[in-house]
Amino acid sequence: MPATRTLRRNRQNAPKGANREAEQLWLSQSVGYHKKRTKMYKDDILNLIKQCPFNIDTEIQISGRPPTTAHSKFLTNKEQGDWAEQIVYKSINNFSADYFAVQYGRSDSISAGDEGFADFYTEYQRELNTIGKRPDILIFKSSDFPKRNVDINNDDHVKKAVVALEVRSSSFLIERYTTFMNERQKDAINRCGAIREQILNSPLGELLKRQKSEIYKFIEEATDETFKELNFRLPSWSSTSELRDLKKLLRELKESIKTLHKRDDLSITPKMEDIALVNRWIQKYNVKHFYLQVFFDKAYVISFQDILELVSNDENEGNNFSIERDEKNQGKTTIKINVKICKEVIGRIDMPEHKSAMKELDRGRLLFYVTFTGGQGYLDNNIFMRDVINA
């Protein structure tokens, strides 16, 4: 934005009755902040995308025919997503005194098969191809809008947001999931240790040493921390009962090791194609962007900038993130960010009420899906300030 336009707008917003010196100071600080913000964020994001190993097409144009029929799963997912957005929106407005949230993403209730959906779909694609993907929630300083009268269709208002949130939902209780997975890992390690001792402290150990010395060495040197690294091909022994017993134990060991290899962390899942669309919006509005994943008991957040830095370092792949073609996400290539490296910004969520709903399609087909109401999120204001507002 030209400095003259910024000065003109800032002069109009200067405190009434301020003396000339105070007014000039206020204006200079405002313009300086605007220039610094313009330089520091959107340019950094664009540079990170250019360095990204996935060849992101920042000029991508979205096209395609609109779907013609809705499905129960889609309607349930949409209801859950809308509920998650409300949890975040209300938790910020209920627990933050200096900042407030405004719903900004598309909130249309229309779905495939409804009258006018084709026009809606075309307009949505046009929006993606011009301004990019709208975040779901914008966060503003209360001091910038004391009456909270933000006009989300006013670009100057949108550019005053301090944070943009893309809200995702997950059908898990992360506490329960984490406990289950930790116990599964512990059981698998204990089983590996028991098999190791059973082999080494019996005649089967000498038999393995003679038959497959490299496997014997792997097992002998293994610890609880290194069982996951063991990799061997199961022998096809069957000539004696001892060899069959040894083969059975080795098979059980491989199965336990396979359990240790399973991905056991939940994730935040930005789609690969969304990177370009999120960037397009950032380049227009220059607002810090975050992904926030809502589970049914907690919510976690990570910045878009951290995601880009993470995937640009191949040492992080397999531990902190993975790249998968997700059949649950319309078969699109998805970045799965380990939620353990994200910040727990909502430390508790009360469960919502849920009930069945029905949608009748034109030809008389009935779709049954789940709706969600109520529940409450409890914002961790320290993390919100440190890892979101001041990040």
Predicted features and spans:
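Interdomain/boundary linker segments immediately adjacent to catalytic/signaling cores
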Residues: 2-133
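Short, solvent-exposed loop/turn segments at secondary-structure junctions
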Residues: 109, 170-172, 296-299
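Structural alpha-beta junctions
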Residues: 93-102, 192-194, 283-289
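Conserved catalytic cores of phosphodiester-cleaving nucleases, focusing on short active-site segments
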Residues: 88, 92, 135-265
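Non-catalytic C-terminal interaction segments of nucleic acid-processing enzymes
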Residues: 3-60, 72, 206, 213-391
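Catalytic micro-motifs at enzyme active sites that drive phosphoryl/nucleotidyl and oxygen chemistry
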Residues: 122-128, 148-155, 278-281
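A structural signal for short, well-ordered beta-strand segments and their strand-loop junctions
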Residues: 101-103, 164-166, 289-294
